[in-house]
Design a protein with these regions (language model features):
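Hydrophobic core of transmembrane alpha-helices in multi-pass small-molecule transporters
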Residues: 7, 76, 89-121
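Juxtamembrane helix-start elements in MFS-like secondary transporters
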Residues: 30-39, 103, 142
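Glycine-rich segments within core transmembrane alpha-helices of 12-TM secondary carriers
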Residues: 134-150
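Extracytoplasmic
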Residues: 1-32, 49-53
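Short hydrophobic/small-residue motifs within alpha-helical transmembrane segments
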Residues: 43-44, 150
Length: 150
């Protein structure tokens, strides 16, 4: 089960996001550098929040946290899939702000959510749960799990 959680974190990993760069450039009005800056900013913000998620994991346990991570990742993927629609709606709501500025903030939020719930919490909870389940042969169990993730 933990291996499925680790594999579920792929949409939050660089390899899961990078394939959409050209699509995002075309539809958000951002250039490659701005997309990269948004990704970096989302990643840094996520890294600052991850210790709090670790404390919540210690407090609530793996079942609650894997549910929250899965729900958050699902919402992040929904936002990511509807970026163009959300950007159009934002342009109508705040007409004075340029499309690229709105696109930049939307992409920062989207990347923050993808990195936090996918690469961050989902990976952390899944790997820690695997380590808790196995007292003996922990390295072997981790290696078997790694076969499916690699």
């Amino acid at each position: 089960m933990t291996t499925v959680g680790i594999m579920s974190s792929i949409p939050g990993q660089t390899m899961g996001v990078g394939v959409y760069t050209d699509y995002l450039i075309l539809h958000t009005g951002l250039n490659r550098l701005e997309i990269s800056m948004a990704y970096m900013t989302g990643t840094i913000l996520s890294s600052l929040l991850l210790p709090t998620a670790g404390r919540l994991y210690d407090l609530w346990g793996s079942r609650v946290m894997i549910f929250l991570a899965g729900t958050g990742l699902g919402l992040a993927l929904l936002l990511f899939s509807e970026t163009v629609w959300v950007l159009k709606k934002l342009e109508l709501l705040v007409p004075g702000i340029p499309r690229t500025t709105l696109g930049l903030f939307l992409m920062i939020l989207t990347f923050l959510m993808l990195r936090q719930f996918g690469q961050g919490i989902m990976s952390m909870v899944s790997r820690n749960t695997l380590a808790i389940w196995f007292d003996r042969k922990r390295g072997f169990a981790s290696g078997i799990s790694g076969l499916f993730v690699a």
